[in-house]
Amino acid sequence: MAIERTLSIIKPDAVAKNVIGQIYARFEGAGLKVVAAKMIHLSRAEAEQFYAVHKERPFFKDLVDFMISGPVMVQALEGESAIVKNRDLMGATDPKKAEKGTIRADFADSIDANAVHGSDAAETAAVEVAFFFPGLNIYSR
């Protein structure tokens, strides 16, 4: 198994619920290390740039509006099969379809306010991590 790095965002709904620590405990319990982290309030331009891949989708405006509605916690996670592990921890995009015990089943309210974002592939993970943590702002251990 390869050591991978992936991006995770704890979205405004989960930050507002004060469950950052509970979500971090799940990352660490699954063997993932937080190698970079910061809390930020995205600007509209930053959210539009980050989610540019969805620009033509009907949900784009609502997604951007939601992501700028409050602070988010952004972290780079590292570990064996980090991308798949993180996606398994998150659960299905729609919390109603997410397996019990996943982050979205436990903390998300709707398909829009779904608590977390995670990279879906190695290529997107590299781009997304670099978006939030350019240069040498990552500390493997």
Curated annotation (Swiss-Prot):
In the UniProt record, the gene name given for this protein reads ndk
GO cellular component entries: cytoplasm
Indicate what this protein is called per its UniProt record.
Nucleoside diphosphate kinase
Q: Does the keyword Coiled coil apply?
A: no
Q: Active site annotated at which positions? A: H117
Top EC group:
transferase
Per its record, the protein catalyses: a 2'-deoxyribonucleoside 5'-diphosphate + ATP = a 2'-deoxyribonucleoside 5'-triphosphate + ADP; a ribonucleoside 5'-diphosphate + ATP = a ribonucleoside 5'-triphosphate + ADP
- Keyword Protein biosynthesis listed? The answer is no
EC number(s): the record gives: 2.7.4.6
Q: Which UniProt keywords apply?
A: ATP-binding, Cytoplasm, Kinase, Magnesium, Metal-binding, Nucleotide metabolism, Nucleotide-binding, Phosphoprotein, Transferase
| Lineage top rank: taxon | Bacteria
Please provide an example of a Pfam family that matches this protein in its UniProt record. Answer: NDK
Please give the InterPro entries that the UniProt record associates with this protein. Answer: NDK-like_dom, NDK-like_dom_sf, Nucleoside_diP_kinase
Which prosthetic group or cofactor does it need? Answer: Mg(2+)
Q: How does it assemble?
A: Homotetramer.
The entry's localization annotation reads: Cytoplasm
Function, as annotated, reads: Major role in the synthesis of nucleoside triphosphates other than ATP. The ATP gamma phosphate is transferred to the NDP beta phosphate via a ping-pong mechanism, using a phosphorylated active-site intermediate.
- Locate the transmembrane regions by residue number: none
Give the signal peptide, or none.
none
Family classification: Belongs to the NDK family.
Q: What intrachain disulfides are recorded?
A: none
PROSITE patterns reported in the protein's UniProt record: NDPK_LIKE
